[in-house]
Amino acid sequence: MTTAPTSPALPASSDTAPTGPAPRGLHVITWGCQMNVYDSARMADVLRPLGYGPVERPEDADMVILNTCHIRERATEKVFSELGRLRKIRDERMSNGADRTIIAVAGCVAQAEGEVILTRAPYVDLVLGPQTYHKLPEMVARAARAGGAVIETDFPVEQKFDFLPTDAAPQTQGNLTAFLTIQEGCDKFCSFCVVPYTRGAETSRPVASVLAEARRMAESGVREITLLGQNVNAYHGDDGKGGSETLAGLVEQLAQIPGLGRIRYMTSHPRDVDQSLIDAHRDNPALMPFLHLPVQSGSDRILKAMNRGHTADEYRESVRKLREARPDLALSSDFIVGHPGETEEDFEATMQLVRDIGFAMAYSFKYSPRPGTPAAGQPMQVPEDVKDRRLAELQALLREQQDAFNADMVGTVQEILVTNRGRKPGQIAGRSPYLQPVHFDGPDHLIGSTVKVAITTRRTNSLGGTLIRETASAC
């Protein structure tokens, strides 16, 4: 940890839990992936003993954390723009007699650009990478003592897992769905991706730790968890017996937790789809029939340039095996168009793969160079207008497939986890095994239950249906 004398003294902090209600406001701004959502919740957890409780507006906060993402283009400039806004809010609070708001930058931009942040925004108090949020209380105390900014961007991911709070997070209490990080980092080094440089090497959380948090979540009312990891199907957590457990084995153990009726996982890498995971989709009804399996391109030449480690046909074969094991399995994926060197032939290969597979959902983006990644320095960068055209064509095909998938739901009966009231009086809502929002008439007491619903209509981004009342059951 390094300390830079660049900011006025912070409010004094306590290392003991308060005896009354949380006297300090905490506002967390989260950008990026589901793992950042999980990390933001855990940062709030570790700050609770210092008296911090959530507030909805940064204007009411004694501490603001900006949890950042470095994946998309212009991520760093977006951070500095937001920091400028937060500085104005802090200055206005102080002019009205409030204590000085602590401004912290966390996440992947902090990891990659920590020193730059303190140089360009010296009013920032704390800079911490995604593996060090468990050190937040120490960092707050140190910054208060030193009267300066504190930066912590090491990669002690094992320590992060060791120091997770042992009680159920307020963010999951009362919620029916939750994220649970089980693996971090990436060893794949795809040419376009910054994750290995911001999240570090692949590391898996011990089985006992995962199970303990999942049990706490279930006891607090969570009925569906999504297991998170940059390469979640590369999970190899310590099993406590001198060996390691696979993702399939972990899912089997999680499915035995009372009250936990649904399990999902993301994000997967095609190289790590093994037979045990395929068998889990066949044998474990708690594992939802919806899989996010990014392929990025349908061209073998571009896949090689991306350093993906598999071919388009190997991806097709993995999908074939998964669908053979679980015929109702639906897929989503990620695509990048305009990777350096991509030709019209390469792009057409991607379009053909999409036609061959058929996706229920997908995310597609134009390639944008990320500083420090191999692809950023590759020749034959594709012109922006070409990338725009290809992206539009790909997205049109993907939308067509998503619409067809949703249309195929009409006339089927789906098990819906009821999560909330609907927008209309007398209406409740939930989500299908395929993550589609479903709205239907029903009583509020069904919230938290899994019910069977006959799907009768499809809308642009949701489904409508009729409750089959006699099948209502607890998840």
Swiss-Prot record:
Q: Where is the MTTase N-terminal domain?
A: 24-145
Q: PROSITE patterns in the record, alphabetically? A: MTTASE_N, MTTASE_RADICAL, RADICAL_SAM, TRAM
List the subcellular locations: Cytoplasm
Could you tell me the superkingdom of the organism this chain comes from?
Bacteria
Q: Where is this region: Disordered?
A: 1-21
Ranges for domain TRAM: 407-469
Keyword Cytoplasm attributed: yes
**Ranges for domain Radical SAM core:** 172-404
Q: Does the keyword Metal-binding apply?
A: yes
User: Recorded E.C. number(s)?
Assistant: 2.8.4.3
Name its co-factor(s). Answer: [4Fe-4S] cluster
Positions that bind [4Fe-4S] cluster 2: 186, 190, 193
Catalysed transformations (reactions): N(6)-dimethylallyladenosine(37) in tRNA + (sulfur carrier)-SH + AH2 + 2 S-adenosyl-L-methionine = 2-methylsulfanyl-N(6)-dimethylallyladenosine(37) in tRNA + (sulfur carrier)-H + 5'-deoxyadenosine + L-methionine + A + S-adenosyl-L-homocysteine + 2 H(+)
- What InterPro entries is this protein classified in? Elp3/MiaA/NifB-like_rSAM (IPR006638), Methylthiotransferase (IPR005839), Methylthiotransferase_CS (IPR020612), Methylthiotransferase_N (IPR013848), Methylthiotransferase_N_sf (IPR038135), MiaB_methiolase (IPR006463), rSAM (IPR007197), rSAM_horseshoe (IPR023404)
Report the main location listed first in the record: cytoplasm
Q: Which UniProt keywords apply?
A: 4Fe-4S, Cytoplasm, Iron, Iron-sulfur, Metal-binding, S-adenosyl-L-methionine, Transferase, tRNA processing
Q: Name one Pfam family in it.
A: TRAM
Cofactor binding note of this UniProt entry: Binds 2 [4Fe-4S] clusters. One cluster is coordinated with 3 cysteines and an exchangeable S-adenosyl-L-methionine.
Q: Where does [4Fe-4S] cluster 1 bind?
A: 33, 69, 108
Q: What is a GO molecular function of this protein?
A: N6-isopentenyladenosine methylthiotransferase activity
- Give the quaternary structure: Monomer.
What family is this protein classified in? Belongs to the methylthiotransferase family. MiaB subfamily.
According to UniProt, the name of this protein is: tRNA-2-methylthio-N(6)-dimethylallyladenosine synthase
Q: Which organism is it from?
A: Gluconobacter oxydans (strain 621H) (Gluconobacter suboxydans)
The encoding gene is miaB
